[in-house]
Each structure stands twice: as structure tokens, then as C-alpha cells.
Amino acid sequence: MRLNTLSPAAGSKPSKKRVGRGIGSGLGKTGGRGHKGQKSRSGGKVRAGFEGGQMPLKQRLPKFGFTSRKSLVTAEVRLSELAKVEGNVIDLNSLKAANVITKNIEFAKVVLSGEIATAVTVKGLRVTKGAKAAIEAAGGKIEE
């Protein structure tokens, strides 16, 4: 193998479409844009959601509800993710240290998803009924 013999695999680099280069090319004159109209012009794009002057769907539908700011600082933690935490006491700080949750999270809830094999103590976190049963079945406990 030599540098001057290197070439890309056949068909891996298709030649780009050359538009407006004569009738024989099949893409001459109008260049695949058809005749007249906004889309035939340069810069003739229609913004996303524009419906030709008709009231767009986004504006026809009513505003509804809001995004709770508390949800932005709340996280769900799966049972299977508790295994990533070193030590047997699990609280908000230990979850952050193990990169299970991000540093801006202020509230966390343990949910039943996956399995837990080791006995752990969950401190200061909310826990679902199913997760509580699974933690206690593994020999762990929940403290408020």
C-alpha cells in the first residue's frame, strides 16, 4: 500500500448534484425547481409552522397549563441505579457524588424499576410503595 494508490471505496463518495448546467444534464434551466412561485426563488423558504396565511394550528389551539418549576429540580431514581452509589447509606448528596442525578436536583424519588441486591439505607428521599417493598425485601430500610 502506498499513499499514491489510496482511493475511497467505489460508490462511497457520490458526486454532488450540479444544477443549471444545460438541458442535457436533466437539471438545466429551472434546475428542478419548476416554474415560478415562492419555492422557485432564491431564499424562497416558508418558515416552520406557516400555513399560507391561514391561522396556524399553534395559534388556533388554546393555551393550557404550565410547567411546574419544581419539576425542574426533581428527579426519579430507579432501584437499579442505587447500585452505582458507594456505601450503604443513600441520600441526595451520595446520589450526586455517584453522578446518578445532576447537581441542580433538590428532590428525588426512588421508583421500582430494576432490581436491588444489596441492603441499603435510604435517607431523606421519597420512595414509592413498590420500591419500599423491594428495598425492605433486600434487607434495607427507609429513614425520613
Curated annotation (Swiss-Prot):
It comes from the Bacteria. InterPro entries: Ribosomal_uL15 (IPR030878), Ribosomal_uL15/eL18 (IPR021131), Ribosomal_uL15/eL18_sf (IPR036227), Ribosomal_uL15_bac-type (IPR005749), Ribosomal_uL15_CS (IPR001196). Residues 1-52 are annotated as: Disordered. Keywords: Ribonucleoprotein, Ribosomal protein, RNA-binding, rRNA-binding. GO terms for cellular component: cytosolic large ribosomal subunit. Residues 21-31 have a biased composition (Gly residues). Disulfide bonds: none annotated. Residues 32-44 have a biased composition (Basic residues). The keyword Ribonucleoprotein applies. SUPFAM superfamilies: Ribosomal proteins L15p and L18e. Coiled coil: none annotated. It holds the Pfam family Ribosomal_L27A. PROSITE patterns: RIBOSOMAL_L15 (PS00475). Signal peptide: none annotated. One of its GO terms (biological process) is translation. Binds to the 23S rRNA. PANTHER family: 50S RIBOSOMAL PROTEIN L15, LARGE RIBOSOMAL SUBUNIT PROTEIN UL15M. Part of the 50S ribosomal subunit. Belongs to the universal ribosomal protein uL15 family. NCBIfam families: rplO_bact. This is Large ribosomal subunit protein uL15. It comes from Aliivibrio fischeri (strain ATCC 700601 / ES114).
